[in-house]
């Protein structure tokens, strides 16, 4: 990239930087908006999974929840920006515009080409626009936090929702949603889903710990991400939804304990050990999830005990390597 173009690009990104929002009540409004908006997205995903044969049009109750959440998010942003007399075109406005255009194009797409099935809804051009717009809107909530060194609750919810949005886009690689492959003979794909998501969990941990998230904030981050994922089963399998929430609570408590250890130890490789523990715990509680599903269904688990053990120990190795992303390459010390 030519130097002048690079400088111009940086300048344009700086122009999109939003104004800090310090009012705690305004920040709470954004929490409500995010939950409404993105729970709506997961409900729509549930409809595409369990009610796909009944969906014949863009105008469904599930889209109603999603787009009303989007509209509420826009209204909250407009209210807060107007109260602060902030009329700047920032990253949040850009995200809202992109999402709006994506929503309109999605309606046209459904009308002309019908309802997508399988992986198609996650990779169609209109949905990619929706994802981009949503990421930018969440980035707005995150970057307008009162303190650049620490995260408030709205920022933690934003990080958790971004994490959940990544899982939404890659839900075809999510073991909690594709657990059926563990009861078949597609072992390579099954293991891949678990390894991918366990590494993602450890990457999120390494990122979040740099903002000095408290143990309670870490619990919220991961618990909320599991709560989002559980909504995927809301329109077809309440038992599975409750099971995901239960396992997610246990895993999040494990993250809470790991974070407590991280802040109280002087271990020179604490970030690597913590990231490894997060990834391994993800595998451990997923094995518990599999065993419970087997006990509550007619499925027959094809994995032997050492294979299930590998779902716990292999993420441990991957997580340790991910933990190295949190240290300085020159000094080996944790990057603050």
Model-derived features with residue positions:
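Membrane-interfacial loop-to-transmembrane alpha-helix junctions, especially the N-terminal start
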Residues: 23-35, 84-99, 149-160, 211-222, ...
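Membrane-interface interhelical loops and short amphipathic "cap" helices
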Residues: 43-64, 108-125, 171-189, 232-237, ...
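Aromatic-anchored segments of alpha-helical transmembrane domains
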Residues: 36-42, 98-108, 160-172, 221-234, ...
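C-terminal transmembrane helix-loop-helix hairpin of multi-pass membrane proteins
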Residues: 241-250, 257-336
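Hydrophobic cores of alpha-helical transmembrane segments in multi-pass inner/ER membrane proteins
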Residues: 64-80, 128-143, 192-207, 245-258, ...
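Loop-centered beta-sheet repeat module
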Residues: 151-205
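Membrane-interface helix-loop-helix junctions at boundaries between adjacent transmembrane segments
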Residues: 86-94, 105-159, 174-182
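N-terminal signal-anchor module of multipass membrane proteins
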Residues: 13-72
């Amino acid at each position: 990239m030519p130097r002048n173009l690079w400088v111009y690009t940086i300048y344009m990104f700086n122009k999109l930087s939003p104004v800090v929002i310090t009012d705690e009540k305004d920040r709470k409004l954004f929490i409500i908006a995010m939950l409404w908006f993105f729970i709506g997205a997961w409900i729509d995903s549930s409809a595409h999974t369990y009610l796909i044969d009944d969906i014949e049009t863009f105008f469904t109750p599930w889209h109603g929840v999603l787009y009303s959440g989007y509209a509420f998010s826009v209204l909250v942003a407009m209210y807060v920006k107007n109260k602060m007399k902030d009329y700047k075109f920032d990253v949040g406005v850009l995200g809202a515009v992109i999402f709006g255009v994506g929503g309109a194009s999605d309606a046209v797409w459904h009308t002309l080409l019908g309802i997508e099935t399988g992986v198609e809804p996650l990779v169609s051009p209109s949905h990619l626009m929706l994802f981009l717009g949503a990421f930018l809107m969440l980035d707005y909530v995150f970057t307008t936090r009162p303190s650049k060194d620490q995260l408030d609750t709205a920022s933690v919810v934003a990080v958790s929702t971004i994490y959940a949005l990544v899982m939404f886009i890659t839900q075809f690689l999510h073991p909690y949603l594709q657990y059926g492959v563990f009861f078949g003979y597609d072992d390579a794909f099954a293991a891949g889903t678990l390894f991918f998501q366990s590494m993602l969990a450890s990457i999120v941990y390494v990122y979040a710990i740099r903002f000095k998230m408290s143990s309670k904030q870490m619990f919220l981050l991961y618990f909320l991400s599991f709560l989002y994922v559980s909504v995927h089963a809301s329109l077809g399998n309440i038992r599975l939804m409750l099971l995901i929430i239960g396992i997610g609570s246990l895993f999040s408590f494990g993250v809470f304990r790991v974070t407590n250890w991280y802040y109280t130890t002087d271990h020179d490789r604490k970030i690597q050990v913590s990231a490894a523990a997060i990834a391994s715990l993800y595998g451990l509680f997923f094995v518990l999830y599999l065993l419970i599903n087997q006990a509550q269904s007619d499925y027959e688990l094809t994995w032997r005990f050492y294979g299930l053990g590998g779902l716990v120990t292999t993420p441990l190795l991957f997580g340790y390597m991910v933990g190295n992303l949190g240290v300085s390459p020159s000094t080996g010390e944790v990057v603050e």
